[in-house]
UniProtKB/Swiss-Prot annotation:
Homodimer. Catalyzes the attachment of proline to tRNA(Pro) in a two-step reaction: proline is first activated by ATP to form Pro-AMP and then transferred to the acceptor end of tRNA(Pro). As ProRS can inadvertently accommodate and process non-cognate amino acids such as alanine and cysteine, to avoid such errors it has two additional distinct editing activities against alanine. One activity is designated as 'pretransfer' editing and involves the tRNA(Pro)-independent hydrolysis of activated Ala-AMP. The keyword Ubl conjugation does not apply. This is Proline--tRNA ligase. Its EC number is 6.1.1.15. InterPro entries: aa-tRNA-synt_IIb, aa-tRNA-synth_II, aa-tRNA-synth_II/BPL/LPL, Anticodon-bd, Anticodon-bd_dom_sf, Pro-tRNA-ligase_IIa, Pro-tRNA-synth_IIa_bac-type, Pro-tRNA-Synthase_IIa_type1. Its main location: cytoplasm. GO terms for biological process: prolyl-tRNA aminoacylation. It is an enzyme of class 6 (ligase). Transmembrane segments: none annotated. CDD domains: ProRS-INS, ProRS_anticodon_short, ProRS_core_prok.
């Protein structure tokens, strides 16, 4: 393809609105243009990459016998009311009405739509298992869209759904798609990790995320530096084994802590480490109050608390409300004496491993010293409620936790019967009885994947696209378009390369060589072939993007040389 005929509006200056490299270079290199906040047009080069990503996804999904479909973008609101998500999804959901005052939403996901079709059409276990998928636009009204395609209001997504008659069918489908996702992300050249994740608003229990490693990522990943463990910070755990405290229990006594408002204040006044002060955080979980007791040197993990309670809503209680019930302000709250206040008590599992804690007394200015869980508290539940710390021992006992940032590019869920039980998704099983269809759902954010690849594939000059997704294989540049020998050789090389299966972008523009080279570096095609001063000798200059060295190559050997060079590249 001739560069003079393709729309590539490159820019020299860094756009003011762009903060991360992927956004900066995609604007400068003419890959995307903003239409509105969080809404972008994919220009020809970006569209070519999107098409290649989608092709790889289709190959791997078809390999596991998944069926491609296409669902509507506009969905009747009653489907989401039927599942209950219409009332819980929040303000990210675009809503509209037609001229007959009927409610619709612009789909942020498609679980309900797929469930509706399967529920209507499949009534016997004999028609299952089944995996369906689509590549479709999605819409979310992000409060603050940012970083280009990484957080937009409209985006491209591949979403898949498995339907099974039993748990084994779900497990098998989950494993198949998990393996397919790994092949997809390997093929596009990503540095990524599969991590334990929270299901969030999708429903279900078991889930995993695929995270592209990137300093600009919004998610924090905790992983073992010498094992396979990896988890989103929301779900990350530390190594734990229950043990008997190694010190004798002392008598529970009240001690003064005047003017102490924080754990640090208490520790300074009492001359003890913050770890030995067990703090109490009070939450409103749906329709009940919950007190969570954790060591003072840790932060509470609200996702873990919410999942433990199986709560739909969780928020920290207001101090005024807490004072009415506890009789004390934040900083003086504790678990002793709460059993008569109709408050559910959760205690982090690490509290039981040590003796003689300091805890709030529910009287301002006083704490209890020598609190021992098994002696001083009844009617409590234990679990892991801590936000893991970097450097702590990995839960598998192999190495220590290291934190890094990532961009979520894929998510897989075992939904179970979360949707089918509410939306009439029943079949007659092998025993002739009705049972709910068991679902899984599996997503890849394609436009976000494009940005993640871009974040990992650049240098100060521009992009260095992995060969599997690069818009072209070869950037063929004519140094002087007024030189007949160079022009003719360029045409012959272009013809030969295309016949050999290469995708070639021919820079035939009447621009200075410096402009052409700068644009070539910015666009980031894997290999550059320059037809210049040695054209009469049938010799061209070959350079791989991201490498400093160049090679003078005879046109007789060019195809073989380029094939070898491409094989060397990522």
């Amino acid at each position: 393809m001739k560069q003079s005929k393709i729309f590539i509006p490159t820019e020299k200056e860094v756009p003011a609105e762009a903060q991360v490299k992927s956004h900066i270079f995609m604007l400068r290199a003419g890959f995307i243009r903003q239409v509105a906040g969080g809404i972008y047009a994919y220009l020809p080069l970006a569209n070519r990459i999107i098409n290649k990503i989608e092709s790889i996804i289709r190959e791997e999904m078809n390999r596991i016998d998944a069926n491609e479909m296409l669902m509507p973008e506009m969905i009747p609101a009653e489907l989401w009311k039927e599942s209950g998500r219409f009332y819980t999804y929040g303000p990210q959901m675009y809503q509209l009405k037609d001229r007959h005052d009927r409610e619709f939403i612009m789909a942020p996901t498609h679980e309900e739509t797929f469930t509706k079709i399967i529920s209507d059409e499949i009534k016997s276990y004999k028609k299952l298992p089944l995996i369906l998928y689509q590549i479709q636009q999605k819409f979310r009204d992000e409060l603050r869209p940012k970083n280009g395609l990484l957080r937009g209001r409209e985006f491209i997504m591949k979403d898949a759904y498995s339907f099974s008659s039993d748990q084994k069918g779900l497990d098998d489908a989950y494993d198949l798609i998990e393996s397919a996702y790994k092949r997809i992300f390997d093929r596009v050249g990503l540095d990524y990790r599969e991590i334990i994740a929270d299901s969030g608003s999708m429903g279900g229990k078991d889930s995993a995320e695929f995270q592209a490693i990137a300093a600009t990522g919004e998610d924090i990943i905790a992983y073992s530096n010498s094992g396979k463990y990896a988890a989103n910070i929301e779900m990350a755990e530390e190594f734990f084994e229950k043990k008997i405290p190694d010190e004798d229990k002392k008598a529970l006594v009240l001690v003064d802590t005047p003017n102490a408002k924080t754990v640090a204040d208490d520790a300074d006044y009492l001359h003890v480490p913050t770890h030995k002060i067990a703090k109490c955080i009070v939450f409103e979980a749906d329709d009940e109050l919950v007190a969570v007791i954790i060591p003072g040197d840790y932060d509470v993990n609200e996702i873990k608390v919410k999942n433990f309670l199986d709560a739909k809503h969780l928020s920290e209680a207001e101090e005024q409300e807490v004072f009415k019930i506890f009789g004390a302000h934040f900083g003086s709250l504790g678990p002793v004496g709460l059993k008569n206040k109709d408050i559910r008590i959760l205690v982090d599992r690490t509290i039981q491993n040590e003796a003689n804690w300091f805890v709030g007394s529910n009287h301002d200015g006083q704490h209890y010293a020598n609190f021992n869980l098994d002696r001083d508290l009844k009617d409590f539940e234990t679990g892991d409620f801590l936000t893991a710390k970097e450097g702590s021992i990995s839960p598998d006992g192999k190495g220590k936790l290291v934190f890094t940032k990532g961009i979520e590019i894929g998510h897989i869920f075992k939904l179970g019967t979360f949707y089918t039980s509410k939306m009439g998704g029943q079949i007659q099983n092998e025993k002739g009885k009705l049972s709910d269809i068991i679902m899984g759902c599996y997503g890849i954010g394609i436009s976000r994947l494009l940005s993640a690849i871009a974040e990992q594939s650049n240098d100060p000059k521009g992009f260095i696209w992995p060969k599997a997704v690069a818009p072209f294989n070869v950037h063929l540049i004519t140094m002087n378009t007024k030189n007949e020998s160079q022009v003719n050789l360029t045409k012959q090389i272009d013809k030969n390369l295309q016949e050999a299966g290469f995708e070639v972008l021919v820079d035939d523009r009447k621009e200075r060589p410096g402009v052409k080279f700068a644009d070539s570096d910015l666009i980031g095609i894997p290999i550059r072939v320059v037809v210049g001063r040695q054209a009469d000798q049938q010799i061209v200059e070959v350079k791989a993007r991201g490498q400093e060295s160049t090679n003078d190559v005879s046109t007789d050997n060019l195809i073989a040389f380029l094939k070898d060079k491409l094989n060397e590249l990522k």
